[in-house]
Structures are given as structure tokens and as C-alpha cells.
């Protein structure tokens, strides 16, 4: 199954608003399609987007410049997932793509993640009468929006040198459902227990600056659970992410 988290604001959120609201877009929130193929993702985003998106720049892997991230200080990644992403990177490189594993243009992810969490918790607290999270005043909220805009501009500079970021969707494959509250949940990754919330480190890379991200299947772990690749592109370059998902899917790993 393929999925697209579209660029922020391009797909209407009607039917997805918080109860009691009258239609204001929800910061950080998007809605996007799921599909069996990347081709169907492309069709779905064209049908649902409020703007006319540009097509992908190329239909050949040899024309793409890729930045690969398989580890950060924010979240531990299962070795099988990291190996699967590295295998895809190697196959892309063999197909002629330019592959890098570091760049001075990559924003400082830990700092942006902290800003993301502050914005996320603020948005959640606004409509939660039981929340004790401290809400910002108006100048404070404007500062948060300025920080987010700066993050998007930082990524815009990165995407002048790269067409996409390849990284894990999450640090683990699917785990058992549990009624344990999110703040108390734990995950075991490579034998090491960590807080569930730290996995949001992979979510925030695309979500905080409002960038599009495709989730593409790239195989399975030793227990047969699917491994997903996250393909992140520049703002409004949704079709580039989708096309890369198609090209990577054609390598035969999904």
C-alpha cells in the first residue's frame, strides 16, 4: 500500500475538522490518499488537490539526486529497517541516481523537532479542556509561525541541491495495538526500550515544514511485517515524491 501526505493546505480538510470548529485549517494537519499503486496516488492527488501541481521532473532514476537518512539523534531505528533503506539507496545508485548520505544544507533536525512538538501540543491543547499545556499568547504564536516558515525556507535551499530525502517512515514495523496512553507507551528497538513518542522524530521531518511525503513499501522484516520508505520532496513537489515511489517500486522490493 502506498500513501501520500500532501503538501500542507492543498487538499481540503472538510469532514476532518475538530468538533465545534467552523472550517479554519488545522496547523500541521493534512489529509491524503492511500492506494495500491503509485500511479493511483498520482491520480488521487490530481483529483483532490485545490491547486494544479507540477509533474515530476523525470521518469528515470538516473536523473534524481537523493539524500539518504537512516539515523538521527531523535529516534532509534531497527537494524532491518535501516538495512532495507540502505539497500534501496544502493539500488537507486546502481540505476544511475546521485546518492548522498549527508549535507550541510540539512536543517538541524533536533531543533526543528522541538519546534514541531511545541506547535503540535499547542494545537491539541486548544480544543482539549483537560489539557494543562501552556498556551502561547498571540505574539508567541506568531513567533512559532515564523519559525515554521524559516524551516520551510531551509528545506527549499536543500531541495535546490537534492530532489528528495529518503528515510524510514518509523523506527519499527507494525506493533501490537495497546490501550496504554501514548505518553506511557514503550517500544523495543534492537533490544533497547525507548519512549513511543520519540518515533515522532521521523514524522516531524516532513510534517513541521508542511512538505509532501510518500510512504512506499520496500519489503518486509524477518517476521513478515512490511517496511515502509518515506520519500520527502519540496513544498508542492508532490508528484516528484509519487514518481520516485513508482520508480523505486519498479525495482521490485515491495
What is each of the regions a protein language model found here?
Residues 43-198, 208, 236, 247-253:
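Amidase signature
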Residues 1-72, 86-95, 207-254:
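Structural helix-boundary/capping segments
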